[in-house]
């Protein structure tokens, strides 16, 4: 769409809005005014040539926004009276402001939208389920668990952390750690929000959502606000960013600073894979910045054991150690994928087998009963091999083939790590400059 087309579209929309306004179709007029302003702002940002043209469009935007706000106020008051006229005194507006905040339907609507971000059920992830990351766990216990359990410890100048940033390569357990915090902080309300929960297409609504998020957190103290991929909301300020993004960032800064509000009992927990794009003022609000690195060998060993669980396998402790050594550079998520792929290998053996043989083992229907007529895949040369496919095997007679070391090595060979060296260099540089190791 060219500049003239965008501007013309904006002019057409506000012209229609004015007509609907005159005809007292206020809801339609409000919709058209807001739509028109969006087109005007698009033209200012991307297409308007010259500062004078931009100033002219901005002045028009303010005029139409002012009228839209008055219409919104009128529609909010469910009374049969005329709307505030253009240029009329704002005394009526002041009267409406005197109404109780708790009765504000717009606030209720925004808070209702945010209620969906509250994790009502605990995720059931314990500290022991998170392999490694001891420094990160200790910092989170210090910030969340101890102040709730021993509030008398954190008085006077000794105050708990208000903001913690978890940064590191993708798949290292940042979100998983947040789930563990939600589980262990029994008395806390856990808000898990993403950028989509806070960004709205309506002008001015996004920053109201941010404000209402913190208001909700204050109402449900003690509370934890977890913002995943915080870089999508709070990247560095620049000339070419939208006005909406700038306002969201400003509201975040105001709320996290606690200007005019109390931040006691509220922890903001952020997670990002690309911390270097965060705005410096936002970075300062996160007092603790913890680097969640790729797992070390002992942590990778624990991860292989955790992901295998009680699945039938033939891996020895030595095999596990070898897998941990061979998986350097793999994140926790990468190891999870390797094990999941290896766990599918017995299923593939069943699918491709042309011969089965009888074995004894626990019954698939009752593991406490040992039966002697289970069928498991085998090679054609095995003693007792019966030529058949999985279709011929009764559902309660299949003997599950165990996961073997060769299955794990095959999966490790085909599943590559997802973290690249360039990102690791940037993350280590950020950690050296601003963070601490987790």
Curated annotation (Swiss-Prot):
Consequence of substituting residue 229 to Q: Loss of ATPase activity
Broad enzyme group: hydrolase
Regions of compositional bias (Basic and acidic residues) in chain numbering: 84-98
Similarity-based family: Belongs to the AAA ATPase family.
Keywords per UniProt: ATP-binding, Cell cycle, Cell division, Cytoplasm, Endosome, Hydrolase, Membrane, Nucleotide-binding, Protein transport, Transport
Organism (species): Bombyx mori
Reaction catalysed by this enzyme: ATP + H2O = ADP + phosphate + H(+)
Protein name according to UniProt: Vacuolar protein sorting-associated protein 4
Superkingdom to which the source organism belongs: Eukaryota
Ranges for region Disordered: 76-113
A GO term from the CC aspect: midbody
GO molecular function: ATP binding; ATP hydrolysis activity; ATP-dependent protein disaggregase activity
Function text: Involved in late steps of the endosomal multivesicular bodies (MVB) pathway. Recognizes membrane-associated ESCRT-III assemblies and catalyzes their disassembly, possibly in combination with membrane.
Sequence ranges assigned to domain MIT in this UniProt record: 7-73
CDD domains per record: MIT_VPS4, RecA-like_VPS4
Tissue distribution of the protein: Expressed highly in head, silk gland and testis with lower levels in fat body and ganglion. Also expressed in ovary and hemolymph, and weakly in Malpighian tube and midgut.
Compartments, record wording: Prevacuolar compartment membrane; Late endosome membrane; Midbody; Cytoplasm
Regulation of its activity: Activated by Mg(2+), but not by Ca(2+).
Entry note about domains: The MIT domain serves as an adapter for ESCRT-III proteins. It forms an asymmetric three-helix bundle that binds amphipathic MIM (MIT interacting motif) helices along the groove between MIT helices 2 and 3 present in a subset of ESCRT-III proteins thus establishing the canonical MIM-MIT interaction. In an extended conformation along the groove between helices 1 and 3, also binds to a type-2 MIT interacting motif (MIM2).
GO biological process: cell division; endosomal transport; instar larval or pupal development; metamorphosis; protein complex oligomerization; protein transport; ubiquitin-dependent protein catabolic process via the multivesicular body sorting pathway; vacuole organization
Lineage of producing organism: Eukaryota, Metazoa, Ecdysozoa, Arthropoda, Hexapoda
Its membrane topology: Peripheral membrane protein
Binding site for ATP: 168-175
Consequence of substituting residue 174 to A: Loss of ATPase activity
């Amino acid at each position: 769409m060219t500049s003239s087309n965008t501007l013309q579209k904006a002019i057409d929309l506000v012209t229609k809005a004015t007509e609907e306004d005159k005809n007292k179709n206020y809801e339609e007029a409000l919709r058209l005014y807001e739509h028109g302003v969006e087109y005007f702002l698009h033209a200012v940002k991307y297409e308007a040539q010259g500062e004078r043209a931009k100033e002219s469009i901005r002045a028009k935007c303010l005029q139409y926004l002012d009228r839209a706000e008055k219409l919104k106020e009128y529609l909010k008051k469910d009374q049969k009276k005329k709307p505030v006229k253009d240029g009329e005194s704002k005394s009526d507006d002041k009267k409406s402001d005197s109404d109780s905040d708790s009765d504000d339907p717009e606030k209720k609507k925004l808070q209702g939208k945010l209620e969906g971000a509250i994790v009502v059920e605990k995720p059931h992830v314990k500290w022991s389920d998170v392999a490694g990351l001891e420094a990160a766990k200790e910092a989170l216990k210090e910030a969340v668990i101890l102040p709730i359990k021993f509030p008398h410890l954190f008085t006077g100048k000794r105050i708990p952390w208000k903001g913690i940033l978890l940064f590191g390569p993708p798949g290292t357990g940042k979100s998983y750690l947040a789930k563990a915090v939600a589980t262990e902080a029994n008395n806390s309300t856990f808000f898990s929000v993403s950028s989509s929960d806070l960004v709205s297409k309506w002008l001015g609504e996004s920053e109201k959502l941010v404000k209402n998020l913190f208001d909700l957190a204050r109402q449900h103290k003690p509370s934890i606000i977890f913002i995943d991929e915080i870089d999508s909301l709070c990247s560095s300020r620049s000339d070419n960013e939208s006005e909406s993004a700038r306002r969201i960032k400003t509201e975040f800064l105001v709320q996290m600073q606690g200007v005019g509000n109390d931040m006691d009992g509220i922890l903001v927990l952020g997670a990002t894979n690309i911390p270097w794009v965060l705005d410096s003022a936002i970075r300062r609000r996160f007092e603790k910045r913890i680097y969640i690195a790729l797992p070390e060998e002992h942590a990778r060993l624990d991860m292989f054991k955790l992901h295998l669980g009680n699945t039938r396998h033939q891996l020895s402790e030595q095999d596990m150690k070898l897998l941990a050594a061979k998986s350097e550079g793999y994140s926790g998520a990468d190891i999870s994928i390797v094990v999941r792929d290896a766990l599918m290998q017995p299923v593939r053996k069943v699918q491709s087998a042309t011969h089965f043989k009888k074995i004894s083992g626990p019954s698939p229907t009752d593991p406490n009963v040992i039966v002697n007529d289970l069928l498991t895949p085998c090679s054609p040369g095995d003693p007792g091999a019966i030529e058949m496919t999985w279709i011929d095997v009764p559902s309660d007679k299949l003997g599950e083939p165990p996961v073997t070391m060769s299955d794990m090595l095959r999966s490790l060979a085909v599943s590559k790590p997802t973290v690249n060296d360039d990102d690791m260099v940037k993350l280590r540089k950020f950690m050296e400059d601003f963070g601490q190791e987790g």
